[in-house]
Design a protein with these regions (language model features):
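Core catalytic lobe of class I
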Residues: 1-245, 255
Length: 256
């Protein structure tokens, strides 16, 4: 691709800019797996509990509230661009909540994907519901999909997953803790995913030397885990502060 990388070391590449524009510069069908944690468009004037403290839910301009139509159009554009760079045997994982996951599921089917699994990520230590007017939000949904074409033979490392699960078939409800403080020692991102979660996703659907893409790099957890497991990585991120955070994590002792 002609675009100069913001960072390029040890099969770990970062691009700075609009993900939809930059996806068009990546070679078609060159990616083996995509993990995406797109904006939920939740930021407003609310508050939540984090680390025992009351904090604002305003994450930044990139997460400002949008209309239903705007959110759906955005999801359609980036998922369509991802399909173009994903090889025919590759798969895509997309994390979301009730605020965006229904749009994402619909777009996946509209754009010619077949959903393989609807993973429920159950958080073992979710923040409390301070309003006391709804149930505690303790789960997120991760959709796993492949291209809906007859020749597509997606990769699923069944035996690896079974071994991780005490030699039993792994179910579609995954229990892990939230991101550990040790994973935030270089700085933090407001929607940072835990290393344990990405390890399972990457081990399930890729082999060593496969090329993984995260179109919403954030703090770089996908890339950190990809390198740890001897996979190649490309991350795209609009905010320079999070690219710099990713680089600090990559270059820190222990790669956390």
């Amino acid at each position: 691709m002609s675009k100069k990388f913001y960072y390029d070391e040890d099969n770990f590449k970062l691009l700075h800019g609009d993900t939809i524009l930059l996806l068009k510069k990546i070679e078609p069908q060159s990616i083996d797996m995509i993990f995406a944690d797109p904006p939920y468009f939740l930021s407003g004037d609310g508050i939540t509990c984090s680390g025992g403290k009351m904090v604002s839910v305003n994450k930044g301009k990139w997460d400002e509230k949008r209309s239903i139509k705007e959110k759906h159009n955005f999801n359609k554009r980036w998922i369509r661009a991802c399909k173009n760079v994903l090889n025919d045997n590759g798969t895509i994982w997309i994390s979301g909540t009730m605020h965006n996951i229904y749009s994402i599921g619909m777009v996946l089917e509209e754009e010619g994907f077949k959903i393989l699994n609807n993973i429920t990520w159950k958080k073992l230590n979710p923040p409390p519901n301070i309003s006391c007017r709804t149930f505690v939000h303790s789960t997120e949904t991760i959709l796993w999909a492949k291209k809906d074409i007859s020749k597509a033979k997606h990769k699923f490392n069944y035996d690896v997953m079974k071994k991780l699960n005490n030699n039993k078939q792994m179910k579609d409800v995954w229990e892990t803790s939230l991101t550990k403080p040790s994973e935030k020692k270089c700085g933090k991102h407001p929607t940072q995913k835990p290393i344990e979660l990405l390890e399972r996703i990457i081990l399930a659907s890729t082999d060593e030397n496969d090329l993984i893409l995260d179109p919403f790099n954030g703090s770089g957890t996908t890339g950190i885990v990809a390198n740890k497991l001897n996979r190649k990585y490309i991350g795209i991120e609009k905010e320079k502060e999070y690219l710099d955070l990713t680089i600090r994590r990559k270059e820190s002792e222990g790669n956390v």
